[in-house]
Amino acid sequence: MNRFEVVRWFARSLPWRMASLAALCVLAEAGIAKAPLQAQDFPAVGQASRTTQTLAGLRAPVGVYRDTLGIPHIYAKSAEDAYFALGYVHATDRLFEMEVFRRRASGTLAEVFGKASLDDDIFVRQIGIRRSAEAEWKSPRLDGRIRSELEAYCAGVNARLGELQKSGGSKLPAVFQQLGFTPAPWTPVDALAFPKYMGWDQSGTDTDVWMGMLVEKLGLETVNELFPLDRPYELPTIPGWGAVNKPLGQGVSPAPGSAGVSPALRLPPDFDQAALDLHRRFVSGRYGSKFALGSNNWVIDGIKSATGKPILASDPHLGFSLPSIWYTAHLVAPGLNITGVTFAGFPYTVIGHNDRIAWGLTDMQADAVDYFIEKTDAQHPHQYFYKGAWRALERILEEVPVRGEKPVPQEIESTIHGPLVTTHGVKLALAWTGLGPTFEVIAFQRLNTARGLADYQAALKDLAVPALNVIYADLDGNIAIAPHGALPIRKRGLGRWPVDGSSGDYDWAGTIPDEQLPFALNPTKHFLASANGRPAPVGYPYYLGWMWDPSYRTRRIHELLSKHDHITVEDMEAFQMDAHDSAAEAFVPVLLAAYDRQPFGDEQVRRAIDELRHWNFEATPQSVAERIWAEVRALPT
């Protein structure tokens, strides 16, 4: 048993300044978190409230100090104790959020919220997020260090849970009491399921299904005109593949079937029914919502910064939630000094910096999901036709608990391509590079403890889902960016719409090798940036996707970084809060010209046009023109 000390404010005497990191910053979420925090910004110990607790599971005393923003700063004598303390404070501040995400990932929402959540549970069980997490925990790929840190984190969560469950659970957050249940102990599988669920949330989409319907109804030529693969106005994250000045595609052989477009397809008569069914499931579970959001990150090197060291910004735009998806924390232990944002429920920092490196993330918006039209019939129950023969479907029987009702038996059926995910109409199998065990936990643990460029590159090898643009800086002066993830190589076609699953012609032939994914290091322009746009230019030999975000944000970041030198942290803060609407700057003049050629509408329309005509394209809260432009953009075209 050891002391667990919580101090509400920092003491002036705390000797924890990290002067060597004064120029390495991570700017995260809606606000700005700077490193290092200065001890003198906080009241002295005499002004602090202090509590000391004795908890089973700690190896030595641990101090947890909360700053004026409530951010915990954890000081421990071992990494295991640091993660124990993080689990404890996660459970203290975010227990119900953790429980909801655990149930989302495990397919047990209906156990608490009733039948309305049953289909969400069935869908996530078909994808098999928890089964994948269980396989990861059993895998020998997880070394002893990661296992001990995961177990320590869970022990910290459960220590707090045990305290809250005393007196019949009356100390639990009120929402647990209102719903009438007590959360189960936290396990390493729960922790591993969290990043897998987030990977699906950022990767999953039913766009391919709707594209298939458009191809059938409008024709291939029209669809390719409306949704072109190659848009020359886009600004790629990495204009040339590989290290700076390395020619695009050097040493890369074009992947089979990566050029051109998939042939048009004849969809089965009941395809529309299946498409509507699948879309309903996506809307219900809110998967694929990433396309309405976005993220930015950028980094400048020491030549462009005022300090002579890199400055890095990471600006994730995940959906609004209360509480926020992010949880900021600082952990210090031998071999560990990490600050950044975490997911409550998972021990490792997702975006942040240690005392040697910093990194940030944006969604790559790559295409890692395909749908296969499987051939089944009533004469061959529990079978599907593949390469000239009927094969047995893989079948898993589960029971889904439902509040107030008997558990619902659920049979999950899968083909060689993936689980069958439609309940009506044609049978569609979902292929995703995240099916089965992937090991993002290894990637994040390695990023948390990385000491330099080689460690960063090694960590990327285990970053499979979702595909991310991982931006980087270190105290040696290096800056880099790597669009990275497990991305399929298709034998034929591009997977932009559902394909025949029976022939094997459209099967995947592995994933793009790590060394052939785009990568940039120390560019001559002295900065790098990404904003969910095309990762590599037209002509890159592998198909990565097509639903890139337009380059307006990317161009604005490039504009700001290009025209400034001697950039300070304060400048970076201003860039992050920049409200210039580059999309409006491009389109509003076209709109005004069209109106001037043929005016229409009443006085209200003319007033709206006048607001747009005199707008400076700054999207401030007070801007009437910005609101008008937002309504115009939302109009169906």
Q: What are the residue ranges of the model-derived segments?
A:
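Second-shell loop/turn segments in exported
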Residues: 82-85, 134-148, 442-447, 540-547, ...
